[in-house]
Structure formats: structure tokens, C-alpha cells
């Protein structure tokens, strides 16, 4: 039995493994390991979690005592051990452990669970080895560390503790690299470009620029190309997306300006993928990318239309074809990215264009017509998705401002239908979104709200909603007060908007409100 095997057997006999912060307990375990255990022998005989635990205990013990003497070439063994530990904890199917065959790949969740189980111990080992032996990690090991640093724990293989250790370790390693932009360029060229080479969409050329004459996509191509040969980043190396996300978050505008062609194929491949988690991650990354990407390059290269065409299909990922929860995740991310794109497509400085013909104006109009209104027609019975659409509508209107008046004929009926629904109190989140959406309509389109037809429909919607909310006061519980305040605020905004037209609208609204209050005194609380 080898030294490490003996140590592993001792670890396996433990009922529980102590927390990583319990240094004294770890040193106690380390003290019980065989005296002849060395880094060289550990490197030769590594094994899964028990091996990582034994290694961690060994390192914590040797870190606090000088009884174990390491040979002069221990640093080389430590470097080799770092690479081996990184391979073990990486969120990749483990061919060495016999998990992968040509026709049988483990599920993504299975790989993520295994990596999540091993990562806390492996990352702790890497941190100790790097500190004790002043190791500069090789790029592949660094990629594994990066894959555990995603913000918001968006990857299922990382935890809060693992993320903290990985970020700390990464920060230390980056201090040893004189030019971080060189590392980013190396990752983009030598790691990400080969991984995504076969899954590049037809909309861009191999150099990442807009294709002037793109080939028509085969509708069946997506299924045929969804393989490990075409998408190794999806099936063979789950680090790739997390690493790309880190590159986008880390790169400054100068790096993006110089290396942008290397980003585009990866972004479009993610946006084109049919798996919800990947497409959504691509949308989140695109939003971060656009935030820093120079507007002039976006405009002059034609990439704005490429991104628009890549994201827009996601707006139609709706039930019943797409599960409701998946649809919500995708819609929120897609609208956020498209709104960011609209803000970045302002006309050139000094160039005055009518709103309807400007790139930003056309995109916002398209978002409402082909996005919100089209989707609402199909998903009225899915109240959670309706809430998302209403919240995004408010954001779009705030971007359009007065130019949103052209859409009043669709905006007012959509909001009125939700507010007037007798069962609206059953979905308070959707009701709240409709009220806030109507506030955005009033705030941006107030000059046209003196039109009697619009005014009557809005008053009716507010009155019906106010009565419903008060009738269902007990059912709404804590949400009642919030909804009541927002409804009163909306009615007040409508009154102010009517006064702002400097016409007969204000008097008409006051007369209508007084008549309603005379018939139902409860409405005095609405029209204060």
C-alpha cells in the first residue's frame, strides 16, 4: 500500500471532514499521516476527494512544522502537483477517471456536481502550494482557477467559499504578470478561438467581421452541429464560457478596441445556442461587452445589426414551446441586452435624424412592435411573463420619451387589460408591473393623454383596479399598501398630465372623477 493510499484510507475512515477554516483540526489530521509521505509520492498517486483532503491536511501540517524535510526539487513537484490538482477539480469530463467515451458523455449537472465537491479542497491546496513555493501557475491551471470566479455564482460548480479562494489566488497570480492584456490576448487566441472555431455563425467571417454575403442558415444545422466535435466548449470543457465571461469583464475599452474581432465569434456562438443556460449567459456577457465597446466601432463595422439579429429571435422563446421559467430568464436578459444596444447606436455627433429613422429609434420601435406587443398577444395567460413584458415596456418608454406616443393605441389597451382583470389580485407582481408601466406611459406620453378616448380608458382601468385591490385587501396582505400607494400616485400623475395640456382635458378629468366619487365614495381615496 502506497503512502498516499494509506493516507486516503485514514481520511475515508473519518465520519466528517472539518471545515476548511478549522486549521487545528486539519493539522491534527496531517500529523496522523505517514511520516514518509512527500510531495513526490503524492504527485505519483493522486486520487479524487479523499486524496485532495489528505494532501490538504499534509500541507497544512507541514506548513506549521519543520519535522518533515522536503527535498531540494520539491518546488518542481509542487508545480507538477498544481497542474494535476487543477485537472482534477476542473469542470470538465474526466477521461482519466473513465467517465468519457466517444458516445457517452456525462451530463453537465454530473460534471458540475463533481467539480463543486472537489473544488474547495483543490483550490485550498493550490493557494498553499503557490504561497509556500512561489509558483507561477501555467495558463491551463490559471484557466481552471478563473472558471471558479464568476460573479453571482452563475456556474453550478462554484460556491461562495470556492469563489473567494479562486479570486484571491487569481489576484496573486496576476501580480506576477507584467501586462494583463497579453494574458487576455493569449486566452482569446490560443484557448477560446480554437474551441469556438467550428461553431462560428454565418453572420460573421473567420476574422470576426460582419459577413457581407452570409450564407443562409440551414434550419437543421443547429441540431447537426450540436456535438462535441463542433462545440467542444459545450461538451468537453465547461470552463470556456466562464473564462470568456471573465475576459469580457476584465478587458478595458482599449483591449476591446484592439482585439474585438476575437470576441465576436464567441459571443455569436453563445447567442445562437439552443440551451437556455448558454444562451442566457451569452446575453449577459453581451450586455457587459456592449457597455465597454466603443460606439463608433459598433456603428462603422455593422456589428449593431449583427447583434440585433442574433438576439431578436430570443424574444420569441415563449410558452408552450419554451418552458415558462426558461422564457422568463431569456426574456429579461434579451431585452436588457437590446436596450443596451439601442443606447450604443446613437447617431454620429452633429448628425440630426428623425427618431423614426435613427438607428436607436428604429430599434426601440422594433422592440415594442415585434417584441412586447407580439409576445403579449401569445402569452396573456402566463402572468409571470406578462410581468416581464410590462417591466421591459417601461424601460423602453423611458428611452423613447415623447416619441412613444405613436404606440399609445397599443400601450393603453395592453395596460388597461391587465389592470381591469377581475383576477388581477391573484398576481400582485404582475399588477404592480402594470401600474408602474402605466406610470411610464403617462410620464412620457402626457401631451396626448388629453384625448378623451385615452383618458376614459385610463380612468376606467384605474377605477376597476382600485376597487379590485380594496376588495381583495385581505388576500393581498402586505402587498395591499404598496399597490394602493402606487395606484393613487398614478391617478395623481394622470391629473397633472391633464393639467399640463393647458386645455379642457384637466376640467373634463376633474368632472369625471367627481362623478365617480359621488357614486362610489371609496374612490375619493384614489382621486385625492
Regions inferred by a protein language model and the residue ranges of each:
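Glycine-rich flexible loop motifs, especially short His-Gly-Gly/GGXG/HXGH segments used as catalytic or interaction
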Residues: 2-46, 50, 76, 143-157, ...
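HEAT-repeat alpha-solenoid elements in large eukaryotic scaffold proteins
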Residues: 4-11, 47-66, 114-129, 160-170, ...
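Residue-level signature of the C-terminal ends
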Residues: 32, 36, 58-66, 88, ...
Amino acid at each position: 500500500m502506497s503512502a498516499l493510499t494509506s493516507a486516503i484510507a485514514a481520511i475515508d475512515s473519518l465520519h466528517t471532514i472539518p471545515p476548511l477554516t478549522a486549521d487545528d483540526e486539519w493539522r491534527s489530521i496531517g500529523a496522523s499521516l505517514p511520516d514518509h509521505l512527500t510531495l513526490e509520492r503524492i504527485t505519483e498517486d493522486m486520487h479524487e476527494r479523499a486524496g485532495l483532503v489528505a494532501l490538504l491536511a499534509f500541507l497544512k501540517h507541514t506548513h506549521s512544522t519543520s519535522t518533515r524535510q522536503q527535498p531540494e526539487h520539491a518546488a518542481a513537484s509542487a508545480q507538477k502537483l498544481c497542474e494535476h490538482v487543477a485537472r482534477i477539480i476542473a469542470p470538465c469530463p474526466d477521461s482519466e477517471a473513465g467517465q468519457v467515451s466517444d458516445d457517452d458523455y456525462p451530463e453537465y449537472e454530473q460534471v458540475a456536481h463533481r467539480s463543486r465537491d472537489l473544488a474547495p479542497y483543490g483550490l485550498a491546496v493550490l493557494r498553499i502550494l503557490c504561497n509556500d513555493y512561489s509558483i507561477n501557475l501555467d495558463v491551463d491551471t490559471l484557466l481552471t482557477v478563473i472558471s471558479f470566479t464568476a460573479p453571482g455564482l452563475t456556474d453550478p460548480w462554484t460556491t461562495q467559499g470556492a469563489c473567494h479562494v479562486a479570486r484571491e489566488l487569481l489576484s496573486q497570480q496576476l501580480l506576477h504578470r507584467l501586462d494583463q492584456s497579453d494574458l487576455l490576448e493569449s486566452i482569446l487566441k490560443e484557448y477560446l478561438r480554437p474551441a469556438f472555431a467550428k461553431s462560428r455563425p454565418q453572420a460573421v467571417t473567420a476574422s470576426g467581421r460582419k459577413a457581407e454575403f452570409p450564407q443562409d442558415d440551414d434550419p437543421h444545422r443547429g441540431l447537426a452541429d450540436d456535438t462535441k466535435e463542433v462545440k467542444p466548449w459545450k461538451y468537453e470543457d465547461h470552463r470556456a464560457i466562464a473564462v470568456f465571461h471573465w475576459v469580457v469583464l476584465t478587458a478595458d475599452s482599449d483591449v476591446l478596441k484592439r482585439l474585438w474581432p476575437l470576441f465576436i465569434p464567441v459571443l455569436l456562438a453563445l447567442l445562437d445556442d439552443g440551451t437556455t443556460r448558454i444562451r442566457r449567459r451569452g446575453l449577459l456577457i453581451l450586455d457587459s461587452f456592449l457597455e465597454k465597446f466603443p460606439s463608433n466601432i459598433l456603428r462603422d463595422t455593422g456589428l449593431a445589426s449583427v447583434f440585433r439579429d442574433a438576439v431578436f429571435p430570443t424574444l420569441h422563446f415563449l410558452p408552450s414551446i419554451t418552458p415558462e421559467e426558461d422564457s422568463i430568464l431569456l426574456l429579461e436578459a434579451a431585452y436588457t441586452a437590446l436596450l443596451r444596444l439601442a443606447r450604443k447606436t446613437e447617431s454620429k455627433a452633429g448628425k440630426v435624424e428623425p427618431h423614426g429613422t435613427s438607428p436607436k429609434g428604429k430599434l426601440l420601435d422594433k422592440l415594442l412592435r415585434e417584441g412586447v406587443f407580439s409576445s403579449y398577444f401569445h402569452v396573456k395567460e402566463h402572468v409571470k411573463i406578462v410581468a416581464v413584458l410590462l417591466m421591459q415596456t417601461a424601460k423602453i418608454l423611458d428611452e423613447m420619451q415623447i416619441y412613444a406616443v405613436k404606440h399609445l393605441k397599443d400601450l393603453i389597451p395592453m395596460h388597461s387589460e391587465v389592470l381591469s382583470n377581475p383576477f388581477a389580485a391573484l398576481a400582485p407582481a404582475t399588477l404592480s408591473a402594470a401600474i408602474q408601466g402605466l406610470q411610464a406611459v403617462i410620464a412620457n406620453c402626457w401631451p396626448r393623454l388629453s384625448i378623451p378616448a385615452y383618458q376614459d380608458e385610463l380612468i376606467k382601468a384605474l377605477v376597476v383596479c382600485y376597487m379590485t385591490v380594496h376588495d381583495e385587501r385581505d388576500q393581498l396582505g402586505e402587498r395591499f399598501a404598496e399597490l394602493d400607494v402606487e395606484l393613487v400616485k398614478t391617478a395623481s400623475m394622470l391629473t397633472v398630465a391633464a393639467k399640463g395640456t393647458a386645455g379642457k382635458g384637466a376640467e373634463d378629468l376633474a368632472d369625471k372623477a367627481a362623478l365617480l366619487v359621488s357614486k362610489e365614495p371609496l374612490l375619493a381615496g384614489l382621486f385625492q
